[in-house]
């Protein structure tokens, strides 16, 4: 028996955004049947978001455990209409913005659906309010126009982009969470699910929501602060060890900061007026980091970790992707699964996270070939129309 919590959901992806793709992938990992509708002849633009040497690996990362269909809504036969399809899927994921629904070849049929699906619309900020929005409406600028990028980097340097699709993943995760909440409510109340509409910057605002009231009270924005959390006087740096390994050091509380200062400079450093209090450390952080970096650079990673553990200091190695693949704890937790890339080399992919007790892991399947499941999808919809 299939006990995956979303195995009863049929999801139709109509967009080409990373945020929508992530939302679909999250639900696919819990058993949902996710069908990506791809345009012929080239397929979804997401396939080509990276250089050609990495496209197979990339597509298998973002579209594993999904199905591909290639349906032109204008060429459907009379036996099956767009309304039939929309009425017999549970969720639609798109990225066009609500103002475009009435002219979209798929969603213009939404009002005539006998049974309305839940529509998740995650669109680039400004798409629906171009008269108010400054700059580009491309999704790539979400980190910039949400305030997140302004907080990343050194205090005396330019903003720095985070080289991970944080904005897209946040939007996808929040949309998927909201969708499941709305589906649960609509099924309990026997009503049609209400559409979920979200401009991408709205997801990232949740990450900086505490800084907005502070800015409104002080009349100026919170500034980026290097490796320190903005407005934080804790010690937080990433020094280099003697054997060329970077580590992360964190001493946020006064108690831990004192232990760290005693460790690297003894009572003289810990009691020095420049470092003895949070305010003093905040005013002299650059000098303190020079002392910390010098101490760390005189020892190997193994030595630093051992000494820090003995002194009850928060220190850990900074892993790269290869380190994670060989980390015993990751292996023991079964966080990764092997996948053969359609006759190419084997690779590893993350499995469903979080894990739910008593539910088996979904087998990791290759991302679909273009249009490989069109007939299966049409047969599925046809069967649903007969029931």
Where are these regions (language model features)?
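Aromatic-enriched alpha-helical interface/lid elements that frame and gate functional surfaces
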Residues: 230, 235-311, 315
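Mid-domain beta-loop-alpha active-site segment that forms a flexible
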Residues: 165-180, 200-208, 252, 256
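Glycine-rich beta-alpha junction loops
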Residues: 41, 124-126, 200-205, 243, ...
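Substrate-binding/catalytic subdomain of NAD(P)-dependent oxidoreductase enzymes
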Residues: 182-224
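N-terminal helix-loop segment corresponding to the beta1-alpha1 unit
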Residues: 1-189, 339, 369, 373-387
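Terminal low-complexity tails and localization/encapsulation signals of metabolic enzymes
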Residues: 1-9, 240-242, 322-387
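Active-site Gly/Thr loop motif
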Residues: 218, 222-236
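Short, well-structured beta-strand/strand-turn elements
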Residues: 34-37, 309-323, 384-386
């Amino acid at each position: 028996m299939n006990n995956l919590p979303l195995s009863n959901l049929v999801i139709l992806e109509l967009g080409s955004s990373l945020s929508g793709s992530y939302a679909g992938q999250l639900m696919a990992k819990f058993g949902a049947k996710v069908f990506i509708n791809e345009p012929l002849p080239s397929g979804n633009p997401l396939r080509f978001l990276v250089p050609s040497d990495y496209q197979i690996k990339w597509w298998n990362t973002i579209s594993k455990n999904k199905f591909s269909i290639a349906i032109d809504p204008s060429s459907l036969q009379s036996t099956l209409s767009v309304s039939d399809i929309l009425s017999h899927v549970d969720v639609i994921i798109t990225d066009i913005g609500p103002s475009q629904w009435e002219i979209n070849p798929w969603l213009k049929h939404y009002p005539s659906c006998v049974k309305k699906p839940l529509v998740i619309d995650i669109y680039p900020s400004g798409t629906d309010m171009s008269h108010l929005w400054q700059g580009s409406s491309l999704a790539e600028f979400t980190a910039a126009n949400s305030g997140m990028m302004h907080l990343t980097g050194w205090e005396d340097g330019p903003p720095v982009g985070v080289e991970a699709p944080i904005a897209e993943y946040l939007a996808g995760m929040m949309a998927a969470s909201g969708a499941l909440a709305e589906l649960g409510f609509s099924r309990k109340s026997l009503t049609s699910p209400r559409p979920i509409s979200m401009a991408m910057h709205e997801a990232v605002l949740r990450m900086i929501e505490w800084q907005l009231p502070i800015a409104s009270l002080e009349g100026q924005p919170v500034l980026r602060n290097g490796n320190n959390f903005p407005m934080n006087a804790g010690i937080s740096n990433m020094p280099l060890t003697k054997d060329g390994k970077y580590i992360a050091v964190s001493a946020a509380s006064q108690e831990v900061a004192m232990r760290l200062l005693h460790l690297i400079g003894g009572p003289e450093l810990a009691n020095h007026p420049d470092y003895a209090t949070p305010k003093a450390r905040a005013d002299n952080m650059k000098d303190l980091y020079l002392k910390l970096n010098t101490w760390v650079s005189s020892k190997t990673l193994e030595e630093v970790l051992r000494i820090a553990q003995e002194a009850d200091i928060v220190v850990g190695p900074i892993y790269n992707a290869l380190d994670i693949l060989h980390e015993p704890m990751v292996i023991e937790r079964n966080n990764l699964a092997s996948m053969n890339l359609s006759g190419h080399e084997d690779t590893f992919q993350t499995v469903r996270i979080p894990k739910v007790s008593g539910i088996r892991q979904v087998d990791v399947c290759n991302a679909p070939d273009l249009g490989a499941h069109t007939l299966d999808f049409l047969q599925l919809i046809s069967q649903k129309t007969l029931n």
